[in-house]
């Protein structure tokens, strides 16, 4: 079993191809390079995954939102997506 790696591929091309299902994973060289197209595509359902750790780590793709903390107005969708991705990785061993 091997890993097929392609690239480098321009960001304006690779992210659309990844969203269309041409790739299982798209790796960005730095934080903002990866977050911009993902957040534009689907802000609420974007999830960060740290690969290469000895445990599963997912997180929401937004900040802490201290300005709305405790007001009962936060949207839960990002957190639910992060949990669903983590559960899928643990139970199936693959990304959803």
Residue ranges and their predicted role:
Residues 1-96:
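Glycine-rich phosphate/nucleotide-binding loop
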């Amino acid at each position: 079993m091997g890993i097929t790696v392609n690239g480098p591929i321009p960001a304006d091309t690779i992210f659309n191809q990844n969203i269309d299902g041409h790739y299982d994973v798209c790796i960005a060289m730095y934080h903002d390079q990866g977050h911009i197209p993902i957040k534009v595509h689907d802000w609420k359902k974007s999830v960060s995954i740290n690969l290469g750790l000895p445990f599963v780590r997912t997180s929401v793709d937004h900040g802490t939102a201290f300005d709305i903390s405790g007001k009962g107005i936060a949207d839960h969708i990002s957190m639910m997506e992060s949990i669903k991705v983590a559960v899928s990785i643990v139970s199936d061993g693959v990304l959803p």
